[in-house]
Amino acid sequence: MATQTVEGSSRSGSRRTSVGNLLKPLNSEYGKVAPGWGTTPLMGIAMALFAIFLSIILEIYNSSILLDGISMN
């Protein structure tokens, strides 16, 4: 028989652990969304600053920004 059920092997019950009890409050707000834009503008500013940082790093890597007194091999 291809499908066989062994008595007591089902994982239908959940186990309570101390780590789970500590993390449960973090998951209690699941599915709730704050009204309005929230922190979206702050995230946009952070993304823009990160893009500027990456472009500066890229320009330094490509030597398109000349750094006085630093020799690049």
UniProtKB/Swiss-Prot annotation:
| One function term, GO molecular function aspect | phosphate ion binding
Biased composition, Low complexity: where in the chain?
A: 8-20
Where in the cell does this protein reside? Plastid, Chloroplast thylakoid membrane
Where is the stretch described as Disordered?
1-20
Q: Where is the PTM Phosphothreonine found along the chain? A: T3, T5
Which terms in the GO cellular component ontology are assigned?
Answer: chloroplast thylakoid membrane; photosystem II
Q: Which GO terms describe its biological process?
A: photosynthesis; protein stabilization
Specify the protein's topology with respect to the membrane.
Single-pass membrane protein
Q: Any idea which UniProt keywords this protein has?
A: Chloroplast, Membrane, Phosphoprotein, Photosynthesis, Photosystem II, Plastid, Thylakoid, Transmembrane, Transmembrane helix
Listed InterPro entries: PSII_PsbH (IPR001056), PSII_PsbH_sf (IPR036863)
Q: Where are the transmembrane segments?
A: 41-61
Q: How is it modified after translation?
A: Phosphorylation is a light-dependent reaction catalyzed by a membrane-bound kinase; phosphorylation occurs on Thr residue(s) in the N-terminus of the protein.
- Tell me the domain of life: Eukaryota
Q: Spell out the family assignment given in the record's similarity comment.
A: Belongs to the PsbH family.
Kindly state the subunit structure of this protein.
Answer: PSII is composed of 1 copy each of membrane proteins PsbA, PsbB, PsbC, PsbD, PsbE, PsbF, PsbH, PsbI, PsbJ, PsbK, PsbL, PsbM, PsbT, PsbX, PsbY, PsbZ, Psb30/Ycf12, at least 3 peripheral proteins of the oxygen-evolving complex and a large number of cofactors. It forms dimeric complexes.
Described by its record, this protein's role is as follows: One of the components of the core complex of photosystem II (PSII), required for its stability and/or assembly. PSII is a light-driven water:plastoquinone oxidoreductase that uses light energy to abstract electrons from H(2)O, generating O(2) and a proton gradient subsequently used for ATP formation. It consists of a core antenna complex that captures photons, and an electron transfer chain that converts photonic excitation into a charge separation.
What is the protein name given in its UniProt record? Photosystem II reaction center protein H
Gene field: psbH
